[in-house]
């Protein structure tokens, strides 16, 4: 296994340095992200905004090590991770990152409680009894103490997304990344989801980065960043 390069970033949980990303489209090379630089502090709640096609989701995928970069460096919790192989990247994702997407991706045959437990069971970090106890506590945090035994088809859209948030927290990630988490929800439910993120951020000192097109909802975050033509403003 490669040795990680360390960077003394003190209060920085993630740093992107001179990130370039290209895509090929009908024979044309598109420069999606251009020498992009970003730092996220520990315990910070950050929103990334931009027009459709601005590269917001690409940026979040790069932060989550779901997509590779074409130039630059990525640092997570003072370790350089941009040059790691696939197995090492997966290890970082499992230990340091939590993900929430626009669609909840809950498994229909399992209850809310079981869905939250799955990532921890797969990683085999703890025994099943401990995992179940922590999953119940997380469902209480997101306001679903009475819905633990319900399956996804018995939950509302907002409740499903709250289960997804609890699932993202089960492995105690250093950073939660959320890609348009309110995109499929009505305005009132979207506000509840952002309020929940803020509560988790404040009460648990959880670092969160959320990509959204909803500028009004992003007002509750510590910092708003705008992505335009591959550059942060």
Swiss-Prot record:
Pfam families: ABC_tran. It is found in: Cell inner membrane. It is a peripheral membrane protein. CDD domains: ABC_MJ0796_LolCDE_FtsE (cd03255). PROSITE patterns: ABC_TRANSPORTER_1, ABC_TRANSPORTER_2, LOLD. The keyword Iron does not apply. Belongs to the ABC transporter superfamily. Lipoprotein translocase (TC 3.A.1.125) family. This is Lipoprotein-releasing system ATP-binding protein LolD. It comes from Fusobacterium nucleatum subsp. nucleatum (strain ATCC 25586 / DSM 15643 / BCRC 10681 / CIP 101130 / JCM 8532 / KCTC 2640 / LMG 13131 / VPI 4355). The lineage of its organism: Bacteria, Fusobacteriati, Fusobacteriota, Fusobacteriia, Fusobacteriales.
């Amino acid at each position: 296994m490669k040795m990680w390069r360390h960077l003394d970033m003190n209060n920085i949980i993630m740093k992107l340095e001179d990130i370039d990303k290209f895509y090929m489209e009908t024979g044309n090379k598109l420069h999606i992200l251009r020498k992009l630089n970003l730092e996220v502090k520990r315990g910070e709640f950050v929103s990334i905004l931009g027009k459709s096609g601005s590269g917001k989701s690409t940026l979040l995928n790069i932060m989550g090590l779901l997509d590779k970069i074409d130039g630059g460096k990525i640092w997570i919790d003072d370790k350089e991770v941009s040059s790691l192989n696939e197995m090492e990247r997966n290890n970082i994702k499992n230990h340091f990152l939590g993900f929430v997407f626009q669609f909840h991706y809950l498994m229909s045959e399992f209850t809310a409680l079981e869905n939250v437990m799955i990532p921890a069971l797969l990683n085999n970090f703890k025994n099943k009894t401990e995992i179940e106890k922590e999953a119940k506590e997380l469902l209480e945090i997101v306001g679903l103490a009475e819905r633990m035994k319900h399956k996804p088809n018995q939950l509302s859209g907002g409740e499903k997304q709250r289960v997804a948030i609890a699932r993202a927290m089960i492995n105690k990630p250093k950073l939660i990344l959320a890609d348009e988490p309110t995109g499929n929800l009505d305005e009132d439910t979207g506000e509840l989801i952002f309020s929940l993120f803020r509560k988790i951020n404040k009460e648990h000192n959880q670092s969160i980065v959320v990509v959204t097109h909803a500028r009004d909802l992003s007002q509750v975050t510590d910092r708003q960043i705008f992505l335009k033509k591959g550059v942060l403003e």
